[in-house]
Amino acid sequence: MGPYCAPHPLSLLVQAAALAAALAQGTLPAFLPCELQPRGKVNCNWLFLKSVPRFSAGAPRANVTSLSLISNRIHHLHDSDFVHLSNLRVLNLKWNCPPAGLSPMHFPCRMTIEPNTFLAVPTLEELNLSYNGITTVPALPSSLVSLSLSRTSILVLGPTHFTGLHALRFLYMDGNCYYKNPCQQAVEVAPGALLGLGNLTHLSLKYNNLTEVPRRLPPSLDTLLLSYNHIITLAPEDLANLTALRVLDVGGNCRRCDHARNPCRECPKNFPKLHPDTFSHLSRLEGLVLKDSSLYKLEKDWFRGLGRLQVLDLSENFLYDYITKTTIFRNLTQLRRLNLSFNYHKKVSFAHLQLAPSFGGLVSLEKLDMHGIFFRSLTNTTLRPLTQLPKLQSLSLQLNFINQAELSIFGAFPSLLFVDLSDNRISGAARPVAALGEVDSGVEVWRWPRGLAPGPLAAVSAKDFMPSCNLNFTLDLSRNNLVTIQQEMFTRLSRLQCLRLSHNSISQAVNGSQFVPLTRLRVLDLSYNKLDLYHGRSFTELPQLEALDLSYNSQPFSMQGVGHNLSFVAQLPSLRYLSLAHNGIHSRVSQKLSSASLRALDFSGNSLSQMWAEGDLYLCFFKGLRNLVQLDLSKNHLHTLLPRHLDNLPKSLRQLRLRDNNLAFFNWSSLTVLPQLEALDLAGNQLKALSNGSLPPGTRLQKLDVSSNSIGFVTPGFFVLANRLKELNLSANALKTVDPFWFGRLTETLKILDVSANPLHCACGAAFVDFLLEMQAAVPGLSRRVTCGSPGQLQGRSIFAQDLRLCLDETLSLDCFGFSLLMVALGLAVPMLHHLCGWDLWYCFHLCLAHLPRRRRQRGEDTLLYDAFVVFDKAQSAVADWVYNELRVQLEERRGRRALRLCLEERDWLPGKTLFENLWASVYSSRKTMFVLDHTDRVSGLLRASFLLAQQRLLEDRKDVVVLVILRPAAYRSRYVRLRQRLCRQSVLLWPHQPSGQGSFWANLGMALTRDNRHFYNRNFCRGPTTAE
């Protein structure tokens, strides 16, 4: 970013007036510099604002219901900041003034909130003050429903902080005292501080260094979050009156530090201590979190009376041995989710795991998480108690170092929908290996990898092309050590519908026999492997296969001289989605793909340019895909796209992606060969202009993306004939303007026009500004992301931040023209007159010059700005006080019409000028220079510089302008003062000690300042300075 030049104040005034007038007329976006979003939300995030913006009176401020000011630099909130937003309900002020520990540069910051800031908004329901350096709870309106004070500097909550907040239901105050926001103490919640909040249902006090449960909490609470404090004992009285509690989180209070991902305090020996009756009275409890609590065993009494418990989190404890023999699960018949992850023994990986029989009593269990327990073998005895659970749908076993797995055991689970065995060491049905897969958190629902996910242009109908696995039986074996696949692995898994095998090392040639048992398989992910596609009957054993991901299997395609057979595609009758992306396919593949069912093909990341360069060999490569709707040809190194290439694409195409190629030219008229095309993506290419013709008439194109090219010119009327175009992306190009003639009547139907990140030329009166204002409902990010590229001082700024100094003023232009014409005439006349009558002019000039000094001198005397320039040492407070309260008052205020004009540094010096410029102007613009001295033995700084300038004036103008005022007799001992008193007594004045002599002093000082010093010199010694006549 270049240096910023501050505009002239007058320019800012004119600019502000012009913007205010424009806003009053309703032309500019109503909430500049912020952005108005649907449902009355105003977004002011990341604008580096230093104060709350004051929106124009012409803006529909009454319609604003939500204001977001996240990540600005607002350090002071005033009483009047939100008064004009009469219907504001949601206010977000996160990350404006973060505490030192949370600041990126660790700078301390404290936010100031005036008393009536929020009281002035009686409709406010949700307020977020998180990540701000506030030390106390501000005054809040009674309408507040949700309040967030997390990651602030509030360390004390007292009874008066929430007075009158009877409607408050949600209170968040997390992270006010922890390792990232240190405070060296515990947050203090006074007993009964929250008791007055009769409707409070959700209270979160995580990461606050608490050592006990706050006393006398509101009985209305149904959610209490106290995790990651230091509460190591729990007794019934801690939760005595919380009978309505539904969710309780007390995890992380006595941590297991060998698995901690952040600074951790070791749990004391024999802790935590939980009283047997701690939870017995919480009959409505549905969720209990005891994770990361250093538990070695579970007491049956802890769960007595918890008949409604549905979610139990016991992860990150030491319960490995206990889960093989516990009996506590027999009575938890309503439990739906159980988390036992990372209950491993330190530095131990067990050969087998056998769950306790009591797991069979979890008849309502739907999800069981057991990743990170570290056992090497998964057999039919491992999960036997779970096989009869009628509702179990999800089972997570990832990251367990399993190298032997009998996958057939999952066929015995009647309702199982998802099994996650990713990040293990499975290499086959019964052959262990020693390698360890990468650690991954796992996923609950299978999703396509990022490389396969359809982009924005495919989002409309993506559901038609990519079947979802959310409600189907899914097995995830990704990130294991599989090298080959045998059909024995999938015995009894005929119900399986989704299989994920990505990120393995499968390098075998699939021949149609590997997946024989999986007769119902619909989705197969084999990405990031090394598959050899040599056989023509690959995957033909899967008659119901709808989606096949073969992306990132590039190694076989990079082998020189090895052929690849893609004819299997024609033999998959149900295949709808196929990905061959990022395989580097360039030669020795089937000459043509054929399929009557395929609707979406991802062929990105290959080398189609090399294939089409081989004459007509691969010209019809895609033509056999008769019902193809979506085709992705991104990153195929295409430099040209000839009409015959488009002509041999399927006529059924609706979406075509050509992103990130090297296309510098596109024949727009050739779009007629794709009559069904609705979306075309040409982003990230090298197009310089949209100039060769226009979009053809009759095209069904609805979306066109040409962003991230180098387009600097568009032919007028280019988009006119595409009357169905709804979305147009021209962002990140080289456009200097946006011309309404490009679109014609299309502007009436265009829903999205993205022109952000273009170097627009913000000249005054630019036509594109008016056009974009007319289209502002269709232009995303108009007020923030549509910026200027020129002139230089506006680069990167909003198009509405124009500097009006750049505007063309016709009157000023005529004046400048007249002045330049006069200068030209003078430039011609002066040499001519010098040539014709130079001697006469020279004589007249010098004759006039002889009279100028006296007149100039007299004129200068009359036009001096000040009678005296007062110089004194500001560091001496007594002297400064005398000058301001005695000298100034006597000479300027009490002399009536004879008042003198004094020049004082603090008052009369011009800001912006250098010290020497102000000093020189003060000495030469004053009749006298008066030095007010308290001592004369050490004179330096401003006094010395002023004295030297006065002496310089004596030498240049032969004027003695020095007047000395001595406040103490001790200063009278100076040799210079004594000499000057003998030569020019009236210019040296002593402040009298007796009040009776002060009247005479002021009279003598007035005479010394109004008369020339020449009249004061002692004629016995000298005549004083004289001026040449």
Curated annotation (Swiss-Prot):
Signal peptide (from-to): 1-24
Membrane topology of the entry: Single-pass type I membrane protein
InterPro entries in the record: Leu-rich_rpt, Leu-rich_rpt_typical-subtyp, LRR_12, LRR_dom_sf, TIR_dom, Toll_tir_struct_dom_sf
Positions where lipid (S-palmitoyl cysteine) attaches: 257, 264
Biological processes, Gene Ontology terms: canonical NF-kappaB signal transduction; defense response to virus; inflammatory response; innate immune response; positive regulation of B cell activation; positive regulation of B cell proliferation; positive regulation of immunoglobulin production; positive regulation of interferon-alpha production
GO molecular function: pattern recognition receptor activity; protein homodimerization activity; siRNA binding; unmethylated CpG binding
Extracellular side: 25-815
Coiled-coil segments: none
Residues carrying covalently attached carbohydrate according to the record: 63, 128, 199, 209, 241, 331, 339, 380, 472, 511, 565, 667, 692, 729
Keyword annotations of the record: Cytoplasmic vesicle, Disulfide bond, Endoplasmic reticulum, Endosome, Glycoprotein, Immunity, Inflammatory response, Innate immunity, Leucine-rich repeat, Lipoprotein, Lysosome, Membrane, Palmitate, Receptor, Repeat, Signal, Transmembrane, Transmembrane helix
Disulfide bond residue pairs: 34-44, 97-109, 177-183, 254-267, 257-264, 469-498, 762-788, 764-807
Binding positions for DNA per the UniProt entry: 46-50, 71-76, 94-108, 131, 151, 178-180, 207, 261
Cytoplasmic side: 837-1029
One Pfam family cited in the UniProt record for this chain: LRR_12
Family: Belongs to the Toll-like receptor family.
Quaternary structure annotation from Swiss-Prot or TrEMBL: Monomer and homodimer. Exists as a monomer in the absence of unmethylated cytidine-phosphate-guanosine (CpG) ligand. Proteolytic processing of an insertion loop (Z-loop) is required for homodimerization upon binding to the unmethylated CpG ligand leading to its activation. Interacts with MYD88 via their respective TIR domains. Interacts with BTK. Interacts (via transmembrane domain) with UNC93B1. Interacts with CD300LH; the interaction may promote full activation of TLR9-triggered innate responses.
Identification of the protein by name: Toll-like receptor 9
Protein's organism: Ovis aries
